[in-house]
C-alpha cells in the first residue's frame, strides 16, 4: 500500500512538472511570439513528463521487459548515457554562465552593449534590460565610453545600434561617449566589429560586456578569441523569459565548445 502511494505521488509530481514546463516554455511564444530551440526543447520535455506520468505503469513494465533482453539492455544503456552526457553538459554550462555573470568590472573605460532585437524602432524587453544596466553603470562612471553593437534585422525599422543610441541619449548619456556598430548580425560579429572600433579609436581592449546574465559566458569566450579582455555587467532577465533563453544558450555553449 505504501509503495502504491509513493508511485501515485510520483505521478502527480510528474504531471505537475510536465504541465508547468509546457506553460513556462509556451508563455513567451503565446505572449511575445518568441520561438527558438529553447522553448521547443522545454515544451518537448514537458510533454514527455506528462506522457510518462499518464502511462507510468505501462512504460515501467515495458522497460523491465526490455531489460531481460540483451538488445533492450543496450538500448537502455545508450539512452542512459545520452541523458548523463546531456545533464553533464547542462551542469557545466550552467556553472560557466553563473561564474561569467559574476565577473565584476574593475577599472575598465570601455563598454560594449550587445544588441538583441528591436520592435519597429523601440528596444525589445530584453534589449531594454541590457540598456538599463548599461545606463546605470554609465551614469555612475563618467569616464566610460560605450560601443553599441547590433545591425538591422527582419522587422526592425532601424539598426539595434541606432535604437540603443536613441534610448541612452534620451536618458541623458552624452553623445560623444557613444559609438555605433551597426553591421553585426551575431554575437561573434558584435565583438569582431566592436574590436575594429576599439583599434580605430585607440581604446582599451579591456572592456565591460553588457548582455543578459545567461549570455555573458559565451560572449566572454568569443571576446577572448578576438583579443578582447572582458568583464560583465548584466541585464536582469524577466523570470518568464529566462528558462527559454537559458536552454537556448546551453545549445550555443555546447556548439562553441565543440566547434
Name every feature range the model reports, one short phrase each:
Residues 9-61:
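Membrane-embedded alpha-helical segments of integral membrane proteins
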Residues 2-5, 33-34, 59-74:
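Membrane-interface helix-boundary motifs at transmembrane edges
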Residues 13, 17, 45, 78-85, ...:
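Hydrophobic alpha-helical transmembrane segments of polytopic
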Amino acid at each position: 500500500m505504501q509503495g502504491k502511494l509513493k508511485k501515485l505521488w510520483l505521478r502527480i509530481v510528474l504531471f505537475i512538472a510536465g504541465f508547468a514546463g509546457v506553460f513556462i516554455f509556451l508563455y513567451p511564444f503565446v505572449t511575445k511570439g518568441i520561438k527558438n530551440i529553447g522553448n521547443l526543447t522545454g515544451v518537448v520535455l514537458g510533454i514527455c513528463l506528462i506522457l510518462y506520468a499518464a502511462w507510468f505503469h505501462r512504460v515501467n513494465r515495458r522497460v523491465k521487459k526490455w531489460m531481460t533482453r540483451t538488445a533492450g539492455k543496450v538500448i537502455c544503456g545508450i539512452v542512459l548515457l545520452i541523458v548523463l552526457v546531456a545533464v553533464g553538459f547542462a551542469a557545466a554550462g550552467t556553472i560557466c554562465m553563473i561564474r561569467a555573470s559574476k565577473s565584476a568590472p574593475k577599472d575598465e573605460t570601455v563598454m560594449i552593449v550587445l544588441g538583441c532585437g528591436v520592435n519597429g524602432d523601440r528596444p525589445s524587453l530584453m534589449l531594454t534590460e541590457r540598456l538599463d544596466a548599461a545606463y546605470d553603470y554609465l551614469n555612475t562612471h563618467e569616464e566610460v565610453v560605450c560601443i553599441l553593437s547590433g545591425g538591422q534585422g527582419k522587422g526592425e525599422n532601424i539598426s539595434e545600434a541606432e535604437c540603443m543610441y536613441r534610448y541612452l541619449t534620451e536618458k541623458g548619456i552624452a553623445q560623444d561617449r557613444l559609438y555605433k556598430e551597426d553591421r553585426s548580425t551575431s554575437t561573434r560579429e558584435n565583438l569582431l566589429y566592436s574590436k575594429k572600433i576599439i583599434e580605430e579609436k585607440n581604446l582599451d581592449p579591456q572592456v565591460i560586456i553588457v548582455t543578459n546574465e545567461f549570455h555573458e559566458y559565451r560572449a566572454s569566450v568569443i571576446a577572448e578569441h578576438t583579443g578582447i579582455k572582458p568583464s560583465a555587467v548584466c541585464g536582469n532577465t524577466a523570470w518568464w523569459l529566462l528558462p527559454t533563453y537559458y536552454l537556448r544558450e546551453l545549445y550555443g555553449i555546447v556548439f562553441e565548445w565543440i566547434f
